[in-house]
């Protein structure tokens, strides 16, 4: 079996159908003894240029190992599904399992947001402690 990288873009109005589509495609691959090495749902993203007067699309990336029969079925499924506005199937030499640059960047942003939230949550507590100390010093000096 050969290794493939598949990217398909779904019409942005049909984003809620993406999970069902992914499930159908994974079932198709698994039924033919194929393996899914990486599956990433990138979500709605801005297109580089308009396609069919659309400026956004829902992206999905899959790295799979499957026989040619499955690839042919996926190609026909993409072709006859009006919701899929673009797709690309590329053969690769090896299985790719590490996170893509898109997913890695998304994970970094998520981690950065968590750190900022922790810093913001900790800052008011420190400020309150400082103001309590200042008030107690003022009260001590008045006495």
From Swiss-Prot:
GO terms for biological process: translation. The keyword Nucleotide-binding does not apply. PANTHER family: MITOCHONDRIAL 28S RIBOSOMAL PROTEIN S6, SMALL RIBOSOMAL SUBUNIT PROTEIN BS6M. It comes from Colwellia psychrerythraea (strain 34H / ATCC BAA-681). Pfam families: Ribosomal_S6 (PF01250). The keyword ATP-binding does not apply. Residues 105-143 have a biased composition (Basic and acidic residues). HAMAP family: Ribosomal_bS6 (MF_00360). This is Small ribosomal subunit protein bS6. One of its GO terms (cellular component) is cytosolic small ribosomal subunit. The lineage of its organism: Bacteria, Pseudomonadati, Pseudomonadota, Gammaproteobacteria, Alteromonadales. Residues 96-143 are annotated as: Disordered.
């Amino acid at each position: 079996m050969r290794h493939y990288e598949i990217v398909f873009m779904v019409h942005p109005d049909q984003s809620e159908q993406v999970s069902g589509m992914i499930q159908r495609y994974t079932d198709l691959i698994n039924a033919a003894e194929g393996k899914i090495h990486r599956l990433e749902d990138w979500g709605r993203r801005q297109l580089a240029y308009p396609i069919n007067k659309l400026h956004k699309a829902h992206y999905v990336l899959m790295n799979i190992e499957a026989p040619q029969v499955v690839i042919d079925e996926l190609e026909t499924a993409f072709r006859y599904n009006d919701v899929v506005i673009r797709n690309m199937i590329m053969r690769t030499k090896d299985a790719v399992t590490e996170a893509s640059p898109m997913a890695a960047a998304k994970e970094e942003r998520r981690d950065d947001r968590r750190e900022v939230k922790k810093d913001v949550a900790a800052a008011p507590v420190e400020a309150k402690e400082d103001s309590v100390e200042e008030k107690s010093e003022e009260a001590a000096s008045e006495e």
